Amino acid sequence: MKIIVAITGASGSIYGIKLYEILKKLGHDVILLASKTGIKVAKYETGMEITPDFDEDDLFAPIASGSYPFDAMVIAPCSMKTLGAIANGFSYNLITRAADVTLKERRKLILLIRETPLNLVHVQNMLKIIQAGGIIMPASPAFYTKPKTIDDMVNFIIGKILDLLGITHNLYRRWGMREDD
């Protein structure tokens, strides 16, 4: 699959970084995008320097057009600013434009939200995304898996994203499986 992974300025950049790494490891063609704030937050939270494939202001990038073939887009984490822009058709940078293209071309768009608590405007914007064909996925790890580390909790969320993309993995123990499975 050809997948766009975008990292915005919300806390939780590890989700986008880890998703990108796992998709590459599994042999998928991945395009990495990041907002300027997303790059700063990733450095602050993880100590990692991320280098996007395109600048967030490059609206001449191939992925800004519906004629460019890709299968899906995941924004992880997705800030409420980015969610609001996408929900209201405001394509002010490459991330929001690529998301707009994803929706208009009826491709899979997954927005991993981490904000809490939510206000009415956030929820209304999520409803607009769902009505437009996108998927809202809260970064809410399960605890039946008995996570022992932050990595265990991150892997659960990444695994759920891979499930939505139809990609086979073994990142977390599924409900009903024994711990030694």
Swiss-Prot record:
The gene is ubiX. Dimethylallyl phosphate binds at Y144, K160. Flavin prenyltransferase that catalyzes the synthesis of the prenylated FMN cofactor (prenyl-FMN) for 4-hydroxy-3-polyprenylbenzoic acid decarboxylase UbiD. The prenyltransferase is metal-independent and links a dimethylallyl moiety from dimethylallyl monophosphate (DMAP) to the flavin N5 and C6 atoms of FMN. Its EC number is 2.5.1.129. FMN binds at G9, A10, S11, S35, S79, M80, K81, T82, R114. Keywords: Flavoprotein, FMN, Prenyltransferase, Transferase. GO terms for molecular function: carboxy-lyase activity; flavin prenyltransferase activity. This is Flavin prenyltransferase UbiX. Disulfide bonds: none annotated. Belongs to the UbiX/PAD1 family. It comes from the Archaea. It comes from Pyrococcus horikoshii (strain ATCC 700860 / DSM 12428 / JCM 9974 / NBRC 100139 / OT-3). InterPro entries: Flavin_trans-like, Flavoprotein, UbiX-like. It catalyses: dimethylallyl phosphate + FMNH2 = prenylated FMNH2 + phosphate.
